[in-house]
């Protein structure tokens, strides 16, 4: 009863009430976007992030000087915003699905009046999200695990004849490889002609995630589990999956990285963190 009353009080005060440390990491992206927006030399602009963070009233001061995390986060946001805009501009009847969306407002940043953008995350996250970023007909919200298949089948039924892209930002490295494989296979089997956009770290970076300037603040509650070795390794998971392209972090915005720009001199580290595009073949090859 005490725990229930505490939860009710927190909800009444509008406090954040995520049920897992992994869900709470979505605050990092929100915080770094807000901090970046205040800079005169900003890489991205997201005033909504400032607004949400102020309303939440969460103390994020321990992350204030995490230069590498902030620069990496906003480069990643810029990449996926650009990909979303490209899809909306070039595709007929596009549906962009943001998996593990957290409190991100990509729809507000990228909407062109065309297509649909679906936001999906765990129910506790979506309950918080609804207070700040309510959905609409062209921006529906789904509270579910990304590993479930019911929402996939629901989208196919709701949007027949549409082409789907899935954006998985800042989430896969926290998961186990068998779960990621299952997710990618389920998407590949249902959405021919689609695209998968995600970021990944190398196996070495996954093993040493406590060296990450923000992850180490969470102690033992949060760490990376999955690292991607070769860029084409995922092609072996399902015959419909085809590597498209990769983009790296530390060869962009060189003036902002500080000493970390020296990582470009060490290829395994320079390419240790990347953002990828995988395509789903229109015609499924025989297995």
Give the ranges of each region predicted by the language model.
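Short SAM/SAH-binding signature in class I
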Residues: 160-170
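Rossmann-like AdoMet
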Residues: 1-97, 101-144, 149, 154-156
């Amino acid at each position: 009863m005490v725990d229930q009353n505490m939860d009710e009080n927190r909800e009444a005060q509008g406090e954040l009430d995520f049920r897992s440390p992994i869900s709470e990491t979505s605050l990092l992206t929100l915080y770094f976007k807000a901090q970046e927006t205040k800079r005169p030399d900003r890489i991205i602009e997201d005033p909504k992030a400032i607004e949400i963070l102020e309303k939440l009233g969460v103390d994020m001061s321990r992350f204030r000087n995490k230069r590498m995390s902030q620069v990496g986060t906003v480069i990643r946001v810029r990449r996926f915003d650009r990909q979303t805009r490209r899809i909306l501009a070039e595709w007929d009847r596009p549906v962009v699905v943001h998996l593990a969306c957290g409190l991100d407002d990509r729809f507000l940043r990228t909407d062109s009046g065309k297509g649909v953008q679906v936001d999906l995350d765990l129910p506790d996250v979506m309950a918080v999200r609804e207070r700040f970023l309510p959905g609409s007909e062209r921006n529906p919200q789904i509270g579910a695990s990304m590993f479930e298949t019911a929402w996939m089948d629901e989208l196919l039924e709701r949007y027949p004849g549409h082409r789907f892209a899935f954006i998985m930002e800042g989430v896969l490295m926290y998961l186990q490889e068998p779960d990621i494989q299952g997710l990618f296979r389920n998407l590949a089997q249902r959405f021919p002609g689609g695209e998968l956009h995600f970021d990944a770290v190398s196996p070495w970076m996954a093993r040493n995630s406590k060296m990450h300037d923000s992850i180490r603040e969470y102690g033992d509650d949060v760490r990376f589990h999955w690292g991607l070795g070769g860029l084409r390794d995922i092609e072996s998971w399902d015959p419909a999956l085809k590597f498209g392209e990769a983009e790296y972090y530390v060869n962009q915005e060189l003036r902002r990285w500080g000493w970390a720009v020296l990582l470009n001199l060490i290829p395994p580290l320079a390419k240790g963190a990347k953002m990828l595009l995988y395509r789903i073949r229109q015609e499924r090859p025989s297995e």
